[in-house]
Amino acid sequence: MKKILALLMMVGLIFCLGGCNIPWMKQKTEKTKAAKVIQADKVEGTMKGMKLKVGVSNDMAPFSYYDSEQKKITGFDIDLLDKLSEYLGFEYELYPMNMKKLEQKIKNKELDLAIAGISITDERQREFSFTDTYYETYLQIVVRKDSQITDRKEITEKKVGVVEGTSSAQYAEDYLSEDNKITYYKNITKVWNDLEKGTIDATIYDTTGIQNYMKEHADNTNLSVLNEQLNSEESNYGIMFVKGYKYLDQFNVALQVLNNDGTYQKLKEQWIKTKE
């Protein structure tokens, strides 16, 4: 996150709510185009009157998950979406589902956008449009404490569980040995349960989600996290839209506004407790 904050603060030096021009930056894997200039004061409220269908996860704490006590979907992504809604003026309705369904419904234009801790991978960028990164993360491997596994190379021939349709699943398919048995799950809760029981030997998951689980189960978990950081460049999160989405620039401007005025940092401090 330090890299993206540094970038946004650099942009913030030429940004003001009174109408300063913002040179726009696209994802680095897209073809380079001439810098696009947008006036910030012409973006606020430009989506007023629109009601968007938003795909989210109900199982990706602390970003987007179902809170059984509040009986609703909540998390960092949901609060960020709410602030984007306030700035741009749109209303929204949440549709919780797994990643594979999110991608399919975005393609079919049954959803307007998805915000669910979605990694901006090269493969996804060929099919979808993304905002600039709003959260930097990476992948790690989790094993049982009694497994004696201390290194990535030691999971060869082991059973590895991953959530289908995620960057974790893609990493497993691309980099694990042919001797590994990969088991695909609909949600991360089932992965954690099976890993705790020993049904699988390891999992690969986003570090923030791992830290959230370890914190919530500090007194009763039998799991251990390997130190190695994996796949950092393709693990960062962005908001996903159908390819060529008309209002992509508005969302990018709004994200910068929320960073520059301190809103983003407040949400991060509220929801995400990570080791720096």
Descriptions of predicted regions:
Residues 16-19:
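C-terminal motif of bacterial Sec signal peptides marking the signal peptidase cleavage site
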Residues 21, 78-87, 146-149, 153, ...:
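Extended ligand-binding regions for polar small-molecule ligands
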Residues 22-44, 48, 167-186, 221-227, ...:
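Ligand-binding clefts/hinges and TM-proximal coupling segments of bilobed small-molecule sensing domains
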Residues 33-117:
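Extracytoplasmic small-molecule ligand-binding "clamshell" domains
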Residues 58, 136-143, 207, 215-256, ...:
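Periplasmic-binding protein-like
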Residues 58-61, 73-86, 118, 140-192, ...:
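Bilobed "Venus flytrap"/periplasmic-binding protein-like clamshell domains
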Residues 78, 86, 91-154, 224, ...:
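Acidic, polar ligand-binding/catalytic clefts
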Residues 104, 118-126, 171-174, 197, ...:
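A ligand-binding cleft/hinge motif common to bilobed small-molecule-binding domains
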